[in-house]
Amino acid sequence: MKLMILDGNSVINRAFYGVRPLTTRDGLYTNAIYGFLNILEKERSEEKPDALCVAFDLHAPTFRHLRYDGYKATRHPMPEELAMQMPVMKQVLAAMNIPVYACEGWEADDVLGTVGRLCEEAGWDCAILTGDRDSLQLVDEHVSVRLVHTQGGQTRTERYTPDVFRAEYGLEPKRLIDLKALMGDSSDNIPGVAGVGPKTANDLLKRFGTLDGVYANLSRENMKGKLFDKLENGRESAYLSYELATIRCDAPIDFTPENNLIRPPKRRALYDLFTTLEFQRLIDRYGLRSAALEQDESEEPAQPVTGSCTLLDVQTPEQAQPLLSGVTLSIAAADDLSMLVAAPHMDGPDQTAYVLRRETLGTDFVPLLQRLFAADVPKTVHDSKPLLRALLALGVEPAGIVFDTAVAAYLLDATRGAYALPQLAQDYLHIPPADEASLPQESVLAIRTACIDGLTEELGKRLREQGMQPLFENIELPLCPVLAQMEHDGILVDAQALHDFGEMLSERIDACESLIFGYAGETFNLNSTRQLGVFLFETLGLPPVKKTKSGYSTNAEVLEKLRDRHPAVQAIMDYRMLTKLKSTYADGLQKVIGPDGRIRTTFQNTVTATGRLSSTDPNLQNIPVRTELGSEIRRMFVPRPGWVLVDADYSQIELRVLAHIADDTRMQEAFRSGEDFHAVTASQVFGVPLESVTPLMRRHAKAVNFGIVYGISEFSLAQDIGVSRAEAKAYIDSYLEKYSGVRAYMHDIKETAREKGYVETIFGRRRAIPEIKSSNFNVRSGAERIALNTPVQGSAADIIKLAMVRVFHALEGLQARLLLQVHDELIVECPQEEAQQVMQIVTNEMEHAAALRVPLVAEAKQGESWYAAK
């Protein structure tokens, strides 16, 4: 039998800093709770415990604080955004029937140790889940520790057993106490022995076994140099630190493993909490949809939509004629389009839903769909793009979509993350979801048409109230069929060239490995950070730049600083670049080439908070461009024989948008002049004539130009362009002095965000930024950068979307096809004889997509590959 216990404070703290800030519509922060539950469920699935509980700290001082006034004295107070989540977290655990333990005067660590001991005495195994390495001292044959790490929004765990601990530290787990006694622990303000670091402490314990062993052998003969004096002077501090670092296993708690057996949650209580916290995904994950109906007898139960309308199974096209009368239809379809249900909008209760089955209608099915999806038949759907793409695959050319509930919901809350129809119906219409698994498919689709009908009215009203109806009708909705057609068409890839490129990369990778192993004198795992760190900093003796808790850091920043110190470092950087190119592009793209030689990506139009499109399965928006070798990937994307690719992109669109939004006359004049804007900026910032601007000045000005859009700090700018912070500050100050409109915009937009809680693009797209009122400086600063950037980046995204719609329709009548959108760039495939006309059409439509105070400029080229056209 196995029990898993969570170090509640440690795990929720990791979750808080590992998950981006999330808030409910009422302003309650929820990211720590959400992250905690995700970590909990992931680890439950890994460990598969029979029993489960959580230990928390209390606010009262512990015996360690009484023993040493400085214990944890350097810790910052808990951020208010996390503190407000703690009581709610405990409510959630109570609703999940997960016991919570805390003991006044004792820390959660001591509860963990005590639970581990009691489990072992009862013949149980115990798994401790924590983000604190202190607990590693508890590891033995029956107690394991799963150490939680969060970085860059990602969470991972390491499982420590005695063997794993010995392999990492070269010591027994219990000796972690002795290690901390010698080296101290800054996070808990445990002093240790002054001047003794981790390496020295570890070496001492490997020689003498324990802290007692170290002091039993304390002599100038055994401890060279100043080490003897450090240990002699630090003896009292070492033993105090030993006491503070020791986790007690005798906390007075009422505990038996059997009292913590996993039980089903209190479904209704958990459902209510998750609804309040707006955890729709977790409601689905825990299967709580039906819990909405589990109410007290005294309450009037909420009624789900049940699909109780009349279902008419269409046998012939004639029976579907009422659908073609011009009334707006709500349509839901099976993923494979084997069945489709269409219901005319009706205010009364006696609604008829028409069921169209492919197997029933046979050869009449596709022609009926073609008529149903004609432009003169208005339709509302949920998430139209996959439906449109499926119709295109059947040979149907769809039109007439007048409302898309998923896209509307995305505009109303772009940070929501998920736009499943049942969730939207519950949130906006207060309709509990039906148990779809127990219903026939036609009833499920009928229910969905009813939800679409209701949401069309509700979401449409909210779009009008928030001034986003024009954005919806002129940009987002017309874009859906454009994206569907682009996904349907795909782009041709030279599979043989891609294979040959991969073979060439393999040869270069082998050469890098041989070079590195030659310097090492042995082979090792180049993908292991630990082994690579040993090679760089021990075998080669290079100076460590940065250390992490798990050892030496070997990230790109570290390698860049070491590049000139040994040729092996450049070889490692080359190895990483080459393996990335091979695995992600050379190999990855080959796997997704279709039978017709084309790759078809999926454009995500309801994902990003700024309104930009993203590309997945595969991502064709991140094809490398910064290195010549990476750019070679673009050579593999080619037109069909006798055709060319036309590539058109905007010139400095975000800076032009900034000039418009900030209404900065000097910046606008620079763009209207047609001069090189970065050179003009350099002239302004450095106070030299335009003809005297050097390439270095231009490069620095370019970094400031683009950095300002993202709220760059003097520290970041200094790092980017290799100057001192003082110089970087002078550049920024000079820039904002010359472009005073930009400076005013940077101030005003942050104040607007604080006042309204959101910012807008030129076209009215909103992004909520509740974090801008955070008491946490880092969180608030990040929110301010979002406030600065979103109107600029979001407006640029709106413009490129408008351009896509314009280009798509302007190309009608030609054979040319719009294939890809990559940020500010459009790629079109066309016959060679259409190329000049297409280039003119595309640039014209892009340049006239929006009327700004400065001209939009687009440039187009053609070529026999994406590389050649760029």
Language-model-detected regions and their locations in the chain:
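Function-dense linear segments that define catalytic or interfacial modules
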Residues: 341-347, 412-435, 444-446, 451, ...
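Conserved catalytic core of nucleic-acid polymerases
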Residues: 488, 596, 600-601, 605-608, ...
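Active-site palm subdomain of RNA-directed nucleic acid polymerases
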Residues: 463-475, 479, 799, 803-826
